[in-house]
Structure formats: C-alpha cells, structure tokens
C-alpha cells in the first residue's frame, strides 16, 4: 500500500522521497538521517564508512581505508558526528559536526575537521554552504575551507550532484570540483562523476573518475 506521507506527486506520477538526501558525494548537508536509519558507503573499494541516525537530529559514524589489505602498512581511520536542525521545514536547515581520525600504524598522525553548514531548499533541490577548519598534527588551519554543494532531482530515481571545495593558504589556492550524478536502484545509491582539481600553481589539466555505492540499512519505507 502506498503511504502518501512518504511519497510526493510530480507531473501526475508518484516519486518516493529522496532516500539519500543527507549528503552529496561525500560532504554532509543540513538534513539528517531519521532515527534508526543508516547507510554504508564505499568508494573505489578503498574508502569505507558507515553512518547511523541516533536521533532525528544527531548522526554518527566510523570510516576506514583498509590499505593493509593491499600491502600497505598505514591505515587511516576516523569517527564523525553531525547535529542538524530544520529552521524552516523542508526549506532551510543548519548543522554542525566534526570528523576526527588517525593513521593506524603511524605516530602523531591525528587529523580532522570541524564544520558548520547551511542548506537552502528541499531534499530534492538544494544548495549547501559550509565552512570547515581542518587540523592535523596538533595544528589548526589558519583559513577555513569553503564548501559549496548542490543537488537537483532529475527524475524518479536520478539526481545531479555537484560538490566543490575552496582551500586557501598563504602559499597556494586550491579548488576541487566534483560533478556527476546519483541513480537510485532499489534504494541503493550509485554515485558517479568526475573530480577536477585546480590550483594556482598547476600547469596541466587533471581529471579523476568517482564511483561509489551507498547501501541503506535500518528503517525502511513500506
């Protein structure tokens, strides 16, 4: 049976609510997982993380890059948490969070980021602006990293996604642009796109493919 509270009408057709509305390729936004919902994300086999909604406003997770499986010795691992609230329901959300990690097998390799985010728009069409202060080796970055991301629904099971980072230091300015899409296949998200880094001292053009899979768990739509 269709539950109208969990679907929306579009041009006479019914679309399920966005099942993966809380993040872009990687960056989080001001929407949160519902209590009891979670997901496992894998990117190119190496990048793995799991996130769980402990309440409707707080989520946390763990991540790891198991390089030891591929002959490496050092293994990055991290914890993350996010708190978010709707200021105007389905139109404007605010959030804040942190990621803290280390490289297992190495000394003095603590790293992380503290961030705040503002998300404008609905789960299907939104713009996200974030500021993050990274830290590593006991030192905090002097300048914040700016993140501008967006998502637009293109169909019943498709989304266009962009995720962009602006990183400035006293020596260099870097922009990382990610463009691509997401297809929902039985509530599993298939992310695909291209990563385009630019910097003030680059001479050539670099493009790297992005391919990820996100598998939900916990609460489901019936």
Predicted region positions:
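Solenoidal tandem-repeat scaffolds enriched in leucines and small polar residues
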Residues: 147-150
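Transmembrane beta-barrel domains of Gram-negative outer membranes and organellar outer membranes
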Residues: 6-114, 119-123, 134-136, 154-222
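A general structural motif
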Residues: 139-145
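A short macromolecule-binding patch
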Residues: 1-3
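Glycine/small-residue-rich phosphate/adenosyl-binding loop
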Residues: 130
């Amino acid at each position: 049976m269709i539950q109208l509270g969990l679907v929306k009408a579009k041009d006479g057709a019914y679309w399920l609510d966005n099942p993966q509305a809380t993040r872009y390729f990687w960056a989080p936004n001001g929407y949160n997982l519902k209590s009891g919902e979670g997901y496992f994300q894998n990117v190119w086999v190496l990048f793995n993380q799991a996130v769980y909604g402990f309440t409707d406003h707080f989520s946390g997770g763990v991540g790891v890059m198991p390089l030891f499986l591929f002959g490496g010795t050092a293994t990055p691992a991290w914890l993350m948490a996010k708190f978010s609230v709707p200021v105007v329901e389905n139109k404007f959300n605010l959030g804040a969070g942190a990621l803290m990690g280390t490289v297992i097998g190495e000394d003095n390799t603590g790293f992380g980021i503290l961030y705040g985010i503002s998300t404008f728009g609905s789960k299907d069409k939104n713009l996200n602006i974030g500021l993050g202060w990274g830290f590593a080796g006991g030192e905090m970055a002097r300048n914040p990293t700016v993140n501008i991301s967006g998502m637009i629904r293109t169909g019943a099971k498709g989304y266009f996604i962009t995720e962009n980072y602006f990183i400035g230091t006293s020596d260099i300015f870097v922009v990382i642009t990610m463009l691509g899409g997401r297809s929902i296949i039985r509530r599993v998200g298939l992310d695909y796109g291209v990563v385009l880094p630019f910097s003030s001292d680059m001479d050539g053009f670099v493009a790297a493919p992005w391919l990820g899979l996100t598998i939900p768990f916990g609460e489901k739509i019936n």
